[in-house]
């Protein structure tokens, strides 16, 4: 008779593209997000939590030629009902909320949201399928005063979490100005618009690569094209030389003062009404920020900001950290972008058919946290709990009473709940928990009404570097009356703070 096959055990591993977060990583992120939330609250924004699951229809992500949603989202179908998906950002749920509750929400509606999002994309080094976003948006405010406020709030948030002035810059541009440049370059003429739309798309993508490719690389893409790093030929926009000069002029229009920059942009947009409106909006944003005390050392008009210009409809902004760090190759590089946003006035239109003005910003949580770690500004790991050890199994209630006394005094504490047979294992456990103190009481100490207090941090320091005389003068373990337990532990914790 054949033996029944054993049921294979499941593999204890995270799915590809996902990871787990422990202790310090979680507390560091929470501390940073709490500080950002305080700033958003200070600026009058309210928190919003939406479901992690949305209908694919609400997210707006699907392939037009098949029944299955886009690979970019994690999606499934329940029987014959709608396709559902995990949210891929925090903006699409906001669009649904703004439309669904438009008769109940105040207008403008100011909200912030923080939480995980999911992308069904190929993972890579530092690129995961689940990550955190931190957004703030104003829906229903057509004035660029809302854009200026978001920029000011972003700068305030960066400083609140520990990024010093001089270590960051918020740069502001406007899609309308770029449209004006395209119009002055003859790319938006109605007679040739259909033919030029492809060229405009190539031009936007080319300008978006300015930081990486430089002037010559972008010029080649605006012209006939160029070979990329793999050797493949990338088709260009095939623009005339004067058109290329006009668009390159936009990407390099930043001057020594904001007034000179705005004058240069005015020249580049020519007679374009939309372009001139964009320049005027930038001037208005600059004036509003100046009135609040935000000068060009913190927030600056900079036409070289091009990320997102294919998506946003008006002002666009990006926060860049300017201090230097070592990259994976040991090279010294500027840290770079940690947040971006802008105006997108088509947010709710897909649901209601009516254009609703909106503007907002999204902070890259993981990147900003990495920056704080690089600067030594991330919240230091909180000490572990005080460990009350178990010397006598039949006195568990007494030990638990000690734990309760410590907790009543606001001291993080726990009772060792493993096998108490080997006392050395209890101290190993305390070390693994980063415990600052171990409390020890055997039957002899109990009879005398005392406890042994072991300063684990000092003990480690003495073991590592102290001489014999120093070891004798600074004992890491003291005997104190039970009544002094809380006071002695508090004193040790205060020394280590």
Swiss-Prot record:
Keywords: Aminoacyl-tRNA synthetase, ATP-binding, Cytoplasm, Ligase, Nucleotide-binding, Protein biosynthesis. Its main location: cytoplasm. SUPFAM superfamilies: Class II aaRS ABD-related, Class II aaRS and biotin synthetases. The keyword Transit peptide does not apply. InterPro entries: aa-tRNA-synth_II, aa-tRNA-synth_II/BPL/LPL, Anticodon-bd, Anticodon-bd_dom_sf, His-tRNA-ligase, HisRS-like_core, HisRS/HisZ, HisRS_anticodon. GO terms for molecular function: ATP binding; histidine-tRNA ligase activity. One of its GO terms (biological process) is histidyl-tRNA aminoacylation. Pfam families: HGTP_anticodon, tRNA-synt_His. It catalyses: tRNA(His) + L-histidine + ATP = L-histidyl-tRNA(His) + AMP + diphosphate + H(+). The keyword Nucleotide-binding applies. It is found in: Cytoplasm. Its EC number is 6.1.1.21. One of its GO terms (cellular component) is cytoplasm. Homodimer. Belongs to the class-II aminoacyl-tRNA synthetase family. NCBIfam families: hisS. HAMAP family: His_tRNA_synth. This is Histidine--tRNA ligase. It comes from Dinoroseobacter shibae (strain DSM 16493 / NCIMB 14021 / DFL 12). The gene is hisS.
């Amino acid at each position: 008779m054949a033996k029944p096959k054993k049921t294979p055990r499941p593999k204890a591993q995270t799915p590809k593209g996902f990871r787990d977060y422990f202790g310090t990583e979680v507390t560091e992120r929470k501390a940073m997000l709490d500080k950002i939330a305080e700033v958003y609250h200070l600026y009058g924004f309210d928190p919003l939590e939406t479901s992690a699951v949305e209908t694919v229809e609400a997210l707006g992500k699907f392939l037009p030629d098949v029944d299955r949603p886009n690979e970019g989202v994690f999606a499934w179908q329940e029987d014959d009902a709608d396709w559902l998906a995990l949210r891929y950002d925090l903006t699409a749920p906001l669009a649904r909320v703004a439309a669904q509750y438009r008769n109940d929400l105040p207008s403008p509606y100011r909200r912030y949201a923080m939480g995980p999002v999911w992308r069904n994309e190929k993972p890579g080094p530092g690129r995961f399928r689940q990550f955190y976003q931190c957004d703030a948006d104003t829906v229903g405010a057509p004035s660029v005063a809302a854009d200026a406020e978001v920029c000011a709030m972003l700068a305030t948030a960066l400083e609140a979490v520990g990024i010093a002035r001089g270590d960051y810059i918020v740069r502001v541009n406007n899609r309308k100005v770029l449209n004006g440049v395209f119009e002055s370059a003859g790319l938006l003429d109605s007679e040739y618009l259909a033919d030029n739309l492809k060229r405009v798309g190539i031009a936007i993508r080319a300008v978006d690569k300015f930081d990486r490719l430089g002037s010559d690389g972008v010029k080649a893409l605006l012209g006939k094209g160029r070979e990329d790093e793999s050797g493949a030929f990338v088709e260009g926009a095939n623009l005339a030389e004067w058109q290329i000069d006009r668009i390159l002029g936009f990407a390099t229009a930043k001057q020594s003062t904001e007034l000179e920059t705005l004058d240069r942009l005015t020249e580049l947009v020519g007679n374009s009404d939309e372009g001139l409106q964009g320049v005027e909006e930038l001037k208005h944003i600059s004036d509003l920020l100046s009135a609040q005390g935000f000068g060009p050392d913190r927030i600056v008009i900079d036409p070289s900001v091009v990320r997102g210009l294919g998506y946003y409809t008006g002002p666009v902004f990006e926060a860049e950290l300017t201090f230097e760090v070592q990259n994976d190759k040991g090279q010294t590089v500027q840290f770079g972008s940690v947040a971006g946003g802008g105006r997108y006035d088509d947010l709710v239109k897909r649901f209601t058919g009516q254009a609703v003005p909106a503007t907002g910003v999204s902070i890259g949580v993981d990147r900003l946290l990495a920056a704080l770690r690089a600067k030594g500004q991330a919240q230091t790991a909180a000490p572990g709990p005080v460990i009350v050890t178990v010397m006598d199994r039949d006195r568990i209630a007494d030990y638990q009473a000690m734990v309760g006394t410590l907790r009543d005094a606001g001291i993080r504490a726990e009772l060792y709940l493993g096998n108490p047979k080997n006392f050395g294992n209890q101290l190993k456990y305390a070390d693994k928990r980063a415990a600052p103190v171990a409390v020890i009481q055997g039957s002899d100490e109990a009879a005398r009404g005392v406890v042994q207090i072991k300063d684990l941090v000092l003990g480690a320091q003495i073991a590592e570097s102290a001489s014999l005389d120093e070891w004798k003068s600074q004992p890491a373990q003291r005997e104190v009356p039970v009544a002094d337990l809380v006071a002695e532990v508090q004193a040790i914790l205060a020394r280590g703070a």
